[in-house]
Amino acid sequence: MEGDIVQMGAYIGAGLACTGMGGAAVGVGHVVGNFISGALRNPSAAASQTATMFIGIAFAEALGIFSFLVALLLMFAV
Amino acid sequence: MAEEAGTGLVFHPMEPFKIHSLFGGEVHWYTPTNATLWMFIGILAISLLFIVGTRGRAIVPSRVQSVAELAYGFVHKMVEDVAGKDGLKYFPYIFTLFLFIVFANFLGLIPMAFTPTSHIAVTGLMAMAVFISVTVLGFMKNGAGFLGLFWVSSAPLALRPLLAVIEVISYFVRPVSHSIRLAGNMMAGHAVMEVFAAFAPLILFSAIGIAVTPLSVLAIVAMYALEMLVAFVQAYVFTILTCVYLKDALHPGH
Amino acid sequence: MANETHAVDAAAAVAGHAAEAAEKGGMPQLDFSTFPNQIFWLTVTLVVIYWLLTRIALPRIASVLADRQGTISGDLAAAEEYKLKAKDAEAAYAKALSDARAQAQKIIAETRSEIQKELDAATAKADAEIAERLAQSEESIAEIRAGALEAVQSVAAETAAEIVVALGGKADKAALSTAVDARVKG
């Protein structure tokens, strides 16, 4: 019985952790959206900043991956 | 279990990441495993592309040779742009990492394949190697001046100690995020495809399968396309972050 | 659905995947017993890739790229040279053309003056001939005219004498000729 409650908590926690991915999605969208709006204003500078955009995406996405990892840990490792 | 037997739905999203010995038996540190197999297939593919493909040394390249040259030029330019001219000395190391990651990622997309880069042990080792060598290099090149990386001289004096603490923490989190980003991305994509794949045979067991099975097959196709993109982008991101860290070590003065 | 199934699995903890996974700590990534194995083989792999790249692939690609760069810049230099040559040739051609044109102009002028000279000579000769002929003609015309006048006078005098005789007069030769002379000249 005790184990069941722990399991339940872990699964609920896993589900909650998944909401973090939404934040990552917002972040990545924000980065790319701003990049595109900037690129449309000044297309000649866009090519040189693509690498910066990918770094930004990577940083924003990493946090979503962390929440996914927490969910996985709760589901399989706790 | 009874329900599982009834519907036939089996979820093993972690199944493709399991490591097992190729020839049976315990997994010791020297045992050839499926990870070994796929790493060696990666080596084989790299040699096919870069050694067999370029054996013509043609001035006007064949298709394979031009792919190899394209990859070379891509990473070479990245290192030069991000880390500067003096970073080119470390180009072979960075190119090795890039090739290993990109081939592991793409070969892992083959059905039934194993993806070495989805394991924290693999990405963690690479990230730690980058972290340690970059830190050592920074101290060797700049001496104590490397610590200037943490002392943000453009900020107001009162804020600098606080910023220094934050910078130090973010510096030491680098290998963690560096490794987990790659492993997590690889793992997430494969696990999601695995979950969709588990839904696919539903049509054999239940009426709602008529609606669910085509949807899940479509979802797998879409995820696969996304994973193709992710496989490349993550290799690119790992490499470019390595270049950024290298630049910090070579030119710590921001 | 995934959670549910897995919950059932895990809770039941029967033999099979879930129990095995639970034994191993769930995620294969966190199964630390496989870490030495992966680290060892990863090191081997990376060293092999590094060795292959630095020994064979990278020098080869770098040399091919350098060769290509050399070929391209060599070709460009050759093209530049050819361009200069073409420019020289063009200049020479233009010079030859203008020379030829000047020569032609000269020849034309010479020819024209020669022709003009000939023409002038011919014209002068023709003029002289014409003048001579004209003089001759005028002379002969004057002769003819004089002859004719004479004839007219003599005919007129004879006719007048005949007419006078016919009218029953006596022909005075001297008076008649004076009268005819006066009439004809008149």
From Swiss-Prot, chain A:
Record has Transmembrane as a keyword: yes
Membrane topology value: Multi-pass membrane protein
TM region(s), chain numbering: 12-32, 54-74
Gene Ontology CC terms: plasma membrane; plasma membrane-derived chromatophore membrane; proton-transporting ATP synthase complex; proton-transporting two-sector ATPase complex, proton-transporting domain
One annotated GO molecular function: lipid binding
InterPro entries per UniProt: ATP_synth_csu_bac/chlpt, ATP_synth_F0_csu, ATP_synth_F0_csu_sf, ATPase_proteolipid_c-like_dom, F/V-ATP_Csub_sf
Transport among keywords: yes
Keywords for the protein's UniProt record, in alphabetical order: ATP synthesis, CF(0), Hydrogen ion transport, Ion transport, Lipid-binding, Membrane, Transmembrane, Transmembrane helix, Transport
Source species, domain of life: Bacteria
Protein localization: Cellular chromatophore membrane
Residues spanning the signal sequence: none
Reversibly protonated during proton transport, annotated site positions: E61
Function: F(1)F(0) ATP synthase produces ATP from ADP in the presence of a proton or sodium gradient. F-type ATPases consist of two structural domains, F(1) containing the extramembraneous catalytic core and F(0) containing the membrane proton channel, linked together by a central stalk and a peripheral stalk. During catalysis, ATP synthesis in the catalytic domain of F(1) is coupled via a rotary mechanism of the central stalk subunits to proton translocation. Key component of the F(0) channel; it plays a direct role in translocation across the membrane. A homomeric c-ring of between 10-14 subunits forms the central stalk rotor element with the F(1) delta and epsilon subunits.
Assembly and oligomerization: F-type ATPases have 2 components, F(1) - the catalytic core - and F(0) - the membrane proton channel. F(1) has five subunits: alpha(3), beta(3), gamma(1), delta(1), epsilon(1). F(0) has four main subunits: a(1), b(1), b'(1) and c(10-14). The alpha and beta chains form an alternating ring which encloses part of the gamma chain. F(1) is attached to F(0) by a central stalk formed by the gamma and epsilon chains, while a peripheral stalk is formed by the delta, b and b' chains.
Family in the record: Belongs to the ATPase C chain family.
NCBIfam families linked to this entry: ATP_synt_c, PRK07558.1
Protein name per UniProt: ATP synthase subunit c
